[in-house]
């Protein structure tokens, strides 16, 4: 079966020449759900073995939405209730052991179905890391056509793409909002932003948590190009068609040299990041923040990081400090 023939729950596929366009459709908000990550895992694995695919364009399939941010419900098994605090140094070996188990063929499905919320969360994180690293090692070029908000986990998926184009529109925002939710990035941002922009900018962006406009993101170096909204997909696909004509072996070796050549510790860095993410998610403050998020989501009928972000930016929406 070709990659374009996959039947996925949250991604619509269309192939023209060697360019496969993947539209994420996860209503109502296009959050990065467990199903989205599972589908991206399946898609990237299939693209790697499909000789007819030289580039993948990832975009949002809902009007005005790219990948808004990670789905808080997907984290429920790990951070939805207070539990004894887990230091990152204790979480790290647990996550490594879990990854070893999940590496066994068929284990992800079993743990996802029978492991409860914690099991589903572990599979989600395992697939996330596996998928984004596969994208970075692949002979397929990945391009993000950012047609809506790309915050938190949505921004981390975009950062895993080789090129990022965004629509020149006011509703498009990019950035890492995790500290506003009493968390740290868990899908790669601490590692990728540091490699992309340097430690000084990475720490500023992740500590502040404030989303950027596309023009700000372009100046920072988060984006490669800003395109008039009506032309975004066509222009991204045109670039993808050029890159898809490159030798896949050349693309793969070039990407591996760029992403992994200067520093062999990206994988270890991702492990450390996930461990810290789990650790901060075990606090009572994280549970309060999650509760407040869902209250706002119901009240506003949209993510509060878009519909009413100021109290979260100011740190006044919920007490994130008290233990």
Task: Identify what each model region corresponds to.
Residues 1-66, 76-77:
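Conserved CoA-thioester-binding segment of acyl-CoA-metabolizing enzymes
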Residues 1-17, 63-65, 209-214, 234, ...:
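C-terminal alpha-helix plus adjacent terminal tail
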Residues 39, 43-46, 127-139:
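Catalytic-core regions built around general acid/base machinery
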Residues 60-130:
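Glycine- (often His-adjacent) and acidic-residue-rich active-site loop
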Residues 125, 129, 152, 211:
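Glycine-rich phosphate-binding loop at the start of an alpha helix
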Residues 131, 135-139, 145, 151-205, ...:
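CoA-thioester-processing core
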Residues 165-167, 223-233:
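Short acidic-hydrophobic, aromatic-tinged amphipathic segments that line or gate anion-handling sites
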């Amino acid at each position: 079966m070709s990659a374009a023939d996959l039947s996925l729950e949250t991604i619509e596929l269309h192939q023209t020449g060697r360019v496969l366009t993947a539209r994420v459709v996860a209503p109502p908000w296009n959050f990065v759900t467990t199903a989205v990550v599972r589908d991206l895992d399946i898609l990237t694995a299939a693209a790697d073995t499909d000789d007819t695919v030289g580039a993948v364009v990832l975009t949002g399939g809902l009007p005005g939405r790219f990948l808004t941010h990670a789905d808080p419900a997907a984290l429920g098994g790990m951070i939805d209730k207070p539990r004894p605090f887990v230091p990152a140094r204790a979480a790290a070996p647990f996550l490594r052991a879990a990854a070893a188990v999940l590496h066994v063929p068929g284990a992800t499905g079993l743990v996802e179905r029978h492991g409860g919320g914690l099991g589903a969360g572990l599979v989600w994180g395992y697939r996330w890391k596996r998928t984004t690293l596969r994208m970075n090692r692949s002979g397929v070029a990945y391009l993000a056509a950012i047609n809506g908000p790309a915050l938190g986990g949505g921004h981390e998926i975009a950062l895993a793409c080789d090129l990022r184009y965004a629509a020149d529109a006011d509703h498009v925002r990019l950035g890492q909002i995790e500290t506003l939710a009493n968390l740290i990035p868990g899908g790669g941002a601490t590692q990728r932003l540091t490699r992309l922009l340097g430690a000084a900018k990475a720490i500023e962006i992740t500590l502040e948590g404030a989303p950027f406009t596309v023009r700000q993101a372009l100046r920072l170096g988060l984006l490669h190009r800003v395109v008039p909204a009506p032309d975004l997909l066509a222009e991204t696909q045109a670039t993808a068609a050029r890159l898809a004509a490159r030798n896949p072996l050349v693309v793969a070796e070039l990407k591996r040299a760029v992403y992994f050549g200067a520093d062999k510790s990206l994988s270890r860095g991702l492990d450390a990041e996930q461990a810290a993410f789990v650790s901060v998610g075990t606090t009572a403050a994280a549970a309060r923040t999650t509760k407040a998020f869902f209250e706002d989501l119901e009240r506003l009928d949209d993510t509060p990081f878009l519909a009413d972000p100021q109290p979260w930016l100011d740190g006044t929406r919920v007490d994130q400090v008290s233990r």
